[in-house]
């Protein structure tokens, strides 16, 4: 059967009103608010809590670092989630921040990534269970992780073998955004060379960082994503303290070499990271989590459930797990193929 030609565009003779649909969607979405879940992964003492507080210009989580120079670094002992409701110009954001144990801190770091990957998959599993209930909620509470901030130690050399393994495991299940922590410990030349070596390692090990390529992007979106890819990993500095520069209070740090202005692009790339996370790609991370990472997980789970049901008592004559789950499995498998998994 021949494909039908695309319909011609028609302009109504008078105003109909369906152009207000975007305003209708906006009103409903503003009333409901938005959910954003971020997980921070990295060794202890790299400023994970401080960066989150700097991004959102609010004290949201307590630092696990040292209060005094001679105090040993305090380690996060278990995966912890903290939730906040933030409002800006009438837009409400329900923010869930997940802090993780400082992986790589022990002598034996074998499979230290397992608890983190398990936590991310557990959120997918909880969402799937609610999605497949007979009387599904209209709005399912979403704890799926939308962004993983991965903190790289500013060694100036290269990624450690454990970094490569963990990045590979995480990039399979979540949107990973790598950052070079405390980049003010590097000179401008050292920072540039370090970034280039890390990019080369990403390419060599085929590590897929967010944002991803997508054939559906237009030229403007592709250009923006390329700019982001050129910056990854972001060399950042975080600070919750205000310092005075030229009579103006700014977020920054004072050290023996001088003053670091967190929002000065000549000093670090924090402003690019914040704009990327909050102003240009926030919705993209939420959609990618749902359409790629969660769909991949769901398709595998439903297929496993169906195969388990088929091999249960009675063998192949057993009934499918449920008509609804059967349909979901088919949909998930199709999307899995479309997304290249």
Language-model features: where?
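Alpha-helical scaffold elements adjacent to nucleotide-binding pockets in ATP/GTP-utilizing enzyme cores
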Residues: 51-55, 112-115, 119, 166-169, ...
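Beta-strand-rich binding-surface signature
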Residues: 15, 22, 27, 33-37, ...
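Conserved GTP-binding G-domain of TRAFAC-class P-loop NTPases and closely related GTPase folds
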Residues: 1-5, 144, 161-162, 172-341
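Conserved Switch II/interswitch segment of TRAFAC-class P-loop GTPases
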Residues: 12, 103-109, 117-161, 177-178, ...
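Generic recognition of flexible, low-complexity loop/linker segments
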Residues: 25-27, 137, 222-223
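Generic structural motif
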Residues: 43, 89, 155, 239-241, ...
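Active-site phosphate-binding and catalytic loops of NTP-dependent enzymes
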Residues: 62-65, 125-132, 209-212
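Conserved G1/Walker A P-loop phosphate-binding module
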Residues: 1-123, 264, 274-278, 338-340
């Amino acid at each position: 059967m021949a494909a039908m030609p695309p319909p011609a565009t028609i302009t109504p003779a008078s105003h109909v009103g369906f152009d207000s649909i975007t305003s209708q969607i906006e009103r409903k979405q503003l009333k409901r608010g938005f959910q954003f879940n971020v997980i921070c992964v990295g060794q202890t003492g790299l400023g994970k809590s401080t960066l989150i507080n700097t991004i959102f210009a609010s004290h949201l989580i307590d630092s696990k670092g040292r209060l005094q120079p001679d105090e040993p670094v305090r380690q996060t002992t278990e995966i912890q989630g903290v939730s906040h409701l933030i409002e800006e110009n009438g837009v409400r954001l329900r923010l869930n921040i997940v802090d993780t144990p400082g992986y790589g801190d022990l002598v034996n770091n074998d499979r230290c990534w397992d608890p983190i990957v398990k936590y991310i998959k557990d959120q997918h599993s909880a969402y799937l269970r609610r999605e497949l209930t007979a009387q599904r909620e209209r709005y399912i509470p979403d704890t799926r992780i939308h962004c993983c901030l991965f903190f790289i130690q500013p060694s100036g050399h290269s990624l450690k073998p454990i970094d490569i393994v963990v990045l590979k495991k995480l990039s399979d299940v979540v949107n990973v955004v790598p950052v070079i922590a405390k980049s003010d410990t590097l000179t401008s030349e050292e920072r540039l060379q370090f970034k280039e070596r890390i990019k080369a390692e990403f390419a060599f090990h085929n590590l897929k960082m967010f944002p991803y390529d997508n054939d559906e992007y237009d030229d403007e979106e592709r250009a923006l994503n390329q700019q982001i890819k050129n910056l990854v990993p972001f060399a950042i500095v975080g600070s919750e303290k205000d310092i005075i520069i030229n009579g103006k209070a700014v977020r920054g740090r004072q050290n023996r070499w001088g003053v670091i202005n967190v929002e000065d692009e000549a000093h670090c790339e924090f402003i690019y990271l914040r704009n990327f996370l909050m102003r240009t790609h926030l919705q993209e991370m939420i959609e990618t989590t749902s359409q790629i990472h969660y769909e991949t997980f769901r398709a595998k789970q439903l297929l496993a459930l169906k195969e388990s049901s088929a091999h249960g008592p009675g063998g192949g004559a057993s009934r499918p797990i449920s008509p609804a789950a059967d349909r979901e499995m088919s949909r998930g498998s199709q999307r899995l193929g479309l997304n290249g998994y």
